[in-house]
């Protein structure tokens, strides 16, 4: 068995699944070259245009090879350790809740900065990557 295969065989299921999904999405980005701004988190487009898919896609799309490489290395290290402690189901729920809550927080803070201080640019900003 190669080192890579041995390393992959030691990664727990939920961690491996989220890593595989992110790598597959990045592969799609490289092959199809979709306009990244169609998938990024943009609070105004989520709130006013009801593009709720951005809550999930913004966490799966990455801006560069370095971006995904660093995220996947940290996901492998931290996610594997955490998943061994809390189990696969809890890890999957933690990842899901993490995606939803970080997106909700980002949207809420952007809207609040717009509503209170008139910072419209916060509502129009696009972000990408597993936050």
Label for each model-derived stretch:
Residues 3-127:
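N-terminal TM1-TM2 helical hairpin plus the immediately adjacent luminal interfacial "cap"
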